[in-house]
Amino acid sequence: MKLVYSTDCEYHIGLKASDIGHYVILPGDPARSEKIAQHFSHPHKVGHNREYVTYTGTLCETPVSVMSTGIGGPSTAIGVEELIHLGAHTFIRVGTSGGMQPDILAGTVVIATGAIRFEGTSKEYAPVEFPAVPDFTVTAALKHAAEDVQVRHALGVVQCKDNFYGQHSPHTMPVHAELTQKWHAWIACNTLASEMESAALFVLGSVRRVRTGAVLLVIGNQTRRAQGLEDIQVHDTENAIRVAVEAVKLLITQDSPR
């Protein structure tokens, strides 16, 4: 079922096909859309409805867009579904995360190679046994971009959750024993970071046959705090944004007819 306004705009994001490029960067924070758009040539705002703030410009003379998704899987899935209706085919999430391994310091850029589906949205797309993995071509482009811009980065699995405070205040939850046991299990499995959107994005991408990827700034590390190690806080997302933008340029070049 496709819901549109009478003006043929998609119902939630308020956009039509001519508003967007086929390559879309997806921050969670609406305020970050404008910051990312400043990396485009000729950026202009094309939409602002609910949590979905959208700018379109060009990279390598190709139309590209940035649209915020808000927090979590449901709003991410709604936004991406509607962008797919409009013809978008490549999506890179740019967001923040919390480090889980003690050597993943704040300021590190994590490129997700898979996501733990500890959330609900992806379960309405595919059985729980189905893996949440990004597109290999997009992930490779993110890796090359991180190397090109020379930022500290790591590749690995991330954990996706629906309850932010279930992670940070598990003792206040009736299911605290399960939350704590699984958290330690994921750390033992070498999960790099925790966030809230990638699992839904990756599974949706597989189901809808579009390309997805994710690059995440680590803003802090509660494992380091628990071990009595220094845990600085880093909130500047510029390095993650640069990696995403350069990856889009690489993908455009690779996709261009030779």
Curated annotation (Swiss-Prot):
SUPFAM superfamilies noted in UniProt: Purine and uridine phosphorylases (SSF53167)
CDD domains according to UniProt: UP_EcUdp-like (cd17767)
Gene Ontology CC terms, in alphabetical order: cytosol
Enzyme Commission number, as recorded: 2.4.2.3
Pathway in which the depicted protein is active: Pyrimidine metabolism; UMP biosynthesis via salvage pathway; uracil from uridine (phosphorylase route): step 1/1
Protein origin, superkingdom: Bacteria
Any one GO MF annotation of this record: uridine phosphorylase activity
Keywords: Cytoplasm, Glycosyltransferase, Transferase
Catalytic activity as recorded in UniProt: uridine + phosphate = alpha-D-ribose 1-phosphate + uracil
Biological process terms in GO annotation: nucleoside catabolic process; nucleotide catabolic process; UMP salvage
Listed Gene3D superfamilies: Nucleoside phosphorylase domain
Chief location: cytoplasm
Location in or out of the cell: Cytoplasm
Matching Pfam families: PNP_UDP_1
Summary of the function given for this chain in its UniProt record: Catalyzes the reversible phosphorylytic cleavage of uridine to uracil and ribose-1-phosphate.
Family named by the database record: Belongs to the PNP/UDP phosphorylase family.
Record protein name field: Uridine phosphorylase
Gene it is expressed from: udp
